[in-house]
UniProtKB/Swiss-Prot annotation:
This is Photosystem I reaction center subunit IV A, chloroplastic. Residues 48-73 have a biased composition (Low complexity). One of its GO terms (cellular component) is chloroplast envelope. The gene is PSAE1. GO terms for molecular function: mRNA binding; protein domain specific binding. It comes from Arabidopsis thaliana.
Amino acid sequence: MAMTTASTVFVLPANVTSVAGASSSRSSVSFLPMRNAGSRLVVRAAEDPAPASSSSKDSPAAAAAPDGATATKPKPPPIGPKRGSKVKILRRESYWFKNVGSVVAVDQDPKTRYPVVVRFAKVNYANISTNNYALDEVEEVAA
């Protein structure tokens, strides 16, 4: 049995009216034929530009507001030891207790329970050489 492919183009215009308060956007979906077999889906979406009112152009306060909004506050200081620094492990139940390892990465999210990833030269009984520790479970040592 021979199968023939039909050349089809399907375009779905978005004629949806926007709800009050929602931004209006324009989108279209089209299925284009391909010679290689298979179908292709093309989705395009574009936002309509908001109409500029003449009152916002004339007032200097409105022009100054976007400049003030772009100002960012300074970054907080980094959490934990620096990457590559040597740390001593203070967690008693750890295989590497009182051993020294090097910091691989530190998660900067303050909600993370164990943000410090430490790599050791010696592997444990499960053939693992890295572990995560809390900030109070590591002590930075001079290299």
